[in-house]
């Protein structure tokens, strides 16, 4: 058992939290799963749990991207666009990670926040990537969010800016997470279920490949923001073409334009 680190995981029952637990178990790293819900009313209980466990590191996978309304399940961030969901969005996507920061900021405990890269939108003045497709542009760690097309992205953008330059925090941006399994949260699985696809070059995060890097940065107590994505870009159509070739030769899909997508979302 590696006793040089003791990691307390918030959001351990979520998709990425479970992936991280499995990864740590294989490394024989000591970790604990937080039992207290991150809520301002639970602040004293959170502090008590942290003191009892006495971790060297805290990592948060807390976030809200889906949920139920009545008997209907919303599996995407469309859930947060429904009436009455702003409070839930603010609670889980802004207040929870900020509350953890406020609790930990005067301690020696390193804090890793798993955030998102879904806070950026292509603009003509964004820096071009060398040797990449003509319509591909690069966002850097110091760039500020510029996408306000969803309630989720707006709230996450403010969280990102609040935490990005704070001491003793690793702010990790992931984008379109992919794994090797057919599971609902896998980006590949998601887009195979869509009726139409708006295909644009984008960054992706292949989770099994990137978890070791997150862990190494945690171990070194790295502070700052990192765009935790794989090199280069790939379009939705390229992903689906590989899915068709490797998984299901009978699979087909339809495209629509950004303008048509905007009409649907408006």
Model regions and ranges:
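SDR active-site strand-loop-helix element
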Residues: 10, 61-62, 111-117, 123, ...
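N-terminal Rossmann NAD(P)H-binding glycine-rich loop of SDR-like oxidoreductase domains
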Residues: 5-26
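NAD(P)H-binding glycine-rich loop region in Rossmannoid oxidoreductase-like domains
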Residues: 40-93
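Substrate-positioning beta->alpha
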Residues: 151-154, 176-219, 224
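A short beta-strand-loop structural module common to alpha/beta enzyme folds
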Residues: 29-41, 253-258
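Mid/C-terminal beta-alpha module of Rossmann-like enzyme folds, strongest
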Residues: 213-265
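Conserved cofactor-binding/catalytic machinery of classical short-chain dehydrogenase/reductase
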Residues: 42, 92-99, 110, 158-159, ...
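Catalytic helix-loop patch of NAD(P)-dependent Rossmann-fold dehydrogenases
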Residues: 82-96, 118-172, 179
